[in-house]
Amino acid sequence: LLGLVASAVLRCDDCIKYHLETSYKEGITKEEMMEAMGIATLVGGTIVIPHLRRAYEFWEALEESGQ
């Protein structure tokens, strides 16, 4: 999750997807992921919000595919 926060703050979409997929496979809950992204927004500011939206959409896709 720390990698996810750092990737969001640095606004690296490919990195965010990597950490989301890894977190999902490790059994991280949606609530834990959203808390981490909230911390990223706190650290990185509002510029992180578009990446938060894409991260949420990617997480939803992971849940739908059941990977």
Language-model regions: role of each:
Residues L1-Q67:
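Hydrophobic alpha-helical segments
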